[in-house]
Amino acid sequence: MAAISAKDVKELRDKTGAGMMDCKKALQENDGDQEKAIAYLRKKGLSQAGKKSGRVTAEGLVDSYIHFGGQIGVLVEVNCETDFVARNEAFKELVQDIAKQIAACPNVQYVDTDEIPQDFVEKEKAVAMGSDALKGKPDNIKEKIVQGKLDKTLKELCLLHQPYIKDQSITVQELLQQAISKLGENMKVRRFTRFVLGEGIDKVESNLAEEVAAQTKPKAEEKPAAKKATSKKKKGKKK
C-alpha cells in the first residue's frame, strides 16, 4: 500500500470538499490514486463537488481577456447558482484565470468531450483503426489501443482536460471542482470564443530578409546626363 501523506489528503480535500478522514480513507482504499479516490468519494456520496454537480447554474459572469499586444482575445461565460457568488472576487478571479487558460490553448475548441460532434469522433476512430501499426492484431486489442488514442485526441481539444497553466499538476476541471468546494455552489464553463488577429485571412507571403536587403541595397550611381551641344552663331563684322 502506498504511503499517504498529509499533502495527498489536503489535495484530495481541496478537490472534493470531503472531510479529512474520509479523504484519507479514500486514498488508502485506492492505493494513493487521486482519481480513483475521487470516484470512491462520489460513489459514497461524500464529495461535495459531486453533490452540487446537478444543481441549476443560471447566474454567473461573462468575462474577456486580451493578450498583450492585442493579438489574441477571449470571451468566456462561466455559470454559478446565485448572483451572490457571481459578485464574489474569488469567482471573478476564477473566470479571468479560465479566460487566460483559453488564450494559452490554441488547439482547444470545446468545453468538454460531450460537445464534440459524433461524426468527427467516428472519422477519427476510422482513421486510427486503419493504421498500419495495427495490422495483424486481434480486434479486441485493436479496439483497446484505438480507444486509448481516441480519448487522448478528444481530450486535447477540450478545455476542462487541459493542465492548468498556473499549476500543471491539476486540470481545469479540477480547478473548477476546487472552486465549487470553496464557494459552495455548482459552477460550469458554458461557452467560450477565442479570437486570433488575422485568422482566416489569406496573407501575402513575403521574405523579410529579402525585403530588408532590397531596402538597404545601395542605389547604382547615376551617370551624369550628356550635355546637349549648343551651336553659337558667329556674329558678322559690321562694315
Swiss-Prot record:
It comes from the Bacteria. GO terms for cellular component: cytoplasm. Pfam families: EF_TS. Keywords: Cytoplasm, Elongation factor, Protein biosynthesis. This is Elongation factor Ts. Residues 213-239 are annotated as: Disordered. It is found in: Cytoplasm. Residues 82-85 are annotated as: Involved in Mg(2+) ion dislocation from EF-Tu. It comes from Acaryochloris marina (strain MBIC 11017). HAMAP family: EF_Ts (MF_00050).
